[in-house]
């Protein structure tokens, strides 16, 4: 025992001697650590200010571009012109995502027939003599909240309303539900809680709203609606009914689409349930009750919606009454069900509002722009009555809004109005032209806000270029004590000046209120506070010349070309829809260029390394690197290094190509794209077998990279060999249970509690426990003592050559494990490939001595976008995987639901944002660079990744503005600009608060303390 204690003491003494534990060094170390801590804090403030500036720029642009129409508060009143009611009561059943081909008969031999969703909802087509079945065309965006607004107001919600699908407020403008309430009708409701959010003041207290956004729950809402109808309609005699309007909104079909896609046996089961329920309602209603069954939108082949493809826009409208002679049909050819109802008669959703108002004897809501459905008038006299009342409402709205001021347009409307009054068959032309005019009017933009946003983003880009490429990183570190205080003070000064001037004089109209004025003042203050110290040291001419010098390097020019190529994609809708292929091609091209560099140009000297050598010889104390080290970096690569580099280039190329095979297609890509990211493929046996393979392959691959630098020591085996393998196995069990749910009939077996428990364990361990362990745990190094003779003992530190990088990558592993859970099986295969791509990129740029070159961050930027597409995403609203928000919870719970969607959508961006520090830290031994120099280089690489993201965001801003009148602006360009803005925001937050604030500073300080140099 005594010998063991003495041996431990001797080893500790040896460690102290190896690490040069001198009292003077300790004192100097403390001072340097304090200086480092101050510098680190100042960097956090600097990048937080840059983030604030860019967020303000995005806010101004978004406010100016995403339209919001002017809503009139007027409410229509009943008068003598109001048509008499044809029905006393209304039963309204909304079946979410009731696509039109779901309800019509489809021949089993017809092209497009699918046994999972065709011919199960027959009730709507069988009662042909007593009902009217129509194709119901929605207006994009096809999200539930926006469709309900259109279905009840008769107006058109704008694109920005799609963002509020999670947060509906009571509709202020006139709507048919409000009119029912004002005309003393009692409204009972059960189903989607969006109704309660929009119409709460008008609904009866007995109403039963249910949470709507938990897309994994197929039955709760539907069963609740059925139970509610049983209590108040099906099992209740007509004379005892206390309601005038009974509304139900079922979600099962929509949720099956989101969870499984339409081609799943659950869709047939859910449609059969709805069919039986409708038949019960038909039997229960009397002649004085109108039954309306309708969908709010359709769904695409993946089961999603939100866009404007025909499958998403074509829904169903069915009106039924037991009273004979109520409807007047058009010619039979108008109701052609062949080719999945392609040529079937269609009406717009906004036409429902005037139609129901006329049938129920209600005033048509004031803001309505719809037109009555012709089949609802049983003769010409009634049709003339309907058209006259609707024309009066439309004319009143036009005169009150006073929006159309163009004399030529007014003349056209007056002529159409005269024709409509004399001939009711021409009345529809007036409404159609008026609707198109208002659509054009509502497409008005706030150019002051748009311009402000673009200018602020351009300036933020210039600021990033200044501190990352034009001024040496070590000099920026020295200037922080001047930059940060002025950046903090100047926004306060500018706020006082702006608000004071606006208060005394007049605030510009586009600022609207003091909040926007304050945001603009803050942005101006940050800009002034940044550039005052810069121009105190440097003049503009010198900075411009430095910019030209930065592009003189071969790899910098390659990086600039790749950034420019990506930014120019958004100049065309054709390029934008194929961005996934272009990005994959760009990353493959980069791999080919590095392979060419290693194989065919072995004597090429790294330009950046030569520059570092020159700086080292001339200004060794400023550059932070010894001249010997710099000169060694500039030497040509040896044969073994070229072989290794060629191998990693091939790995990058192959993994990129394999990942690009996993894709989800945009509608616009048509027959030129075959989707592989499908429900069937995701839960296939081969893919799940691949996920099981990943449990062992991923740790093995990472271990191989660690063994190259002898870094598989101490913490590494615990993290990679034990923790990671265990978490990946638990993750596999989770998705195996999901596969069982998706592909098998569980016979009532509820696996929810198991799934929630597993997911919470994975997130808790990977995101919380593992990161705490990383903060407090050992490094990936081991002290090897040679020769037992105490007088001649020697020691080797295994893992010393990659002490920074190996330890930092453990943090990347933590986030990788967490993000993996929130991605479907095929996406997990892609993320495994990403892990190899990432490590190969680090090895390549270490061998090429390009740790400070722009090409490194650009490569990671390309990787993040390439993996975004190969994990089942596109820059479209329907491609958002909303179901990933319910991995941690059964219902919407902030922040866990939102966290799941963010980690799923932006997982590759988060991983690349954290990993950008590894461009500096990978294969970086302690003692070569000072702590402040190392931190400065990490921050500089973070800034370069932000440059890449900012350029893309700026490009989308400019081109979406340029194409604001383009036919595809809301379908292609606008979603892409929104995604670019969100990508920049996520990257900013990750770089500022994780990479710089949490990870890099902590690790550099920890290693600097340990080695005391």
Curated annotation (Swiss-Prot):
Highest taxon listed in the record's lineage: Eukaryota
Bilayer disposition of the protein: Multi-pass membrane protein
GO BP term (any one): GPI anchor biosynthetic process
Cellular component, GO, one term: endoplasmic reticulum membrane
UniProt pathway annotation: Glycolipid biosynthesis; glycosylphosphatidylinositol-anchor biosynthesis
Positions of transmembrane segments: 41-61, 447-467, 484-504, 515-535, 558-578, 582-602, 643-663, 682-702, 715-735, 761-781, 802-822, 825-845, 868-888, 899-919, 943-963, 977-997
Entry keyword annotation includes Phosphoprotein: no
GO molecular function, one term: mannose-ethanolamine phosphotransferase activity
Broad class of enzyme this protein falls into: transferase
Annotated compartments: Endoplasmic reticulum membrane
InterPro entries assigned to the protein according to its UniProt record, in alphabetical order: Alkaline_phosphatase_core_sf, Phosphodiest/P_Trfase, PIG-O_N, PIGO/GPI13
UniProt keyword annotation of Membrane present: yes
Principal location class: endoplasmic reticulum
Keywords of this entry: Cell wall biogenesis/degradation, Endoplasmic reticulum, Glycoprotein, GPI-anchor biosynthesis, Membrane, Transferase, Transmembrane, Transmembrane helix
E.C. number: 2.-.-.-
CDD domains assigned: GPI_EPT_3 (cd16023)
A Pfam family assignment: Phosphodiest
Glycosylation sites: 184, 205, 336, 399, 423, 539, 707, 742, 750, 755
Function of the molecule: Involved in glycosylphosphatidylinositol-anchor biosynthesis. Transfers ethanolamine phosphate to the GPI third mannose which links the GPI-anchor to the C-terminus of the proteins by an amide bond. Involved in cell wall biosynthesis.
Family that this chain belongs to: Belongs to the PIGG/PIGN/PIGO family. PIGO subfamily.
This protein's name: GPI ethanolamine phosphate transferase 3
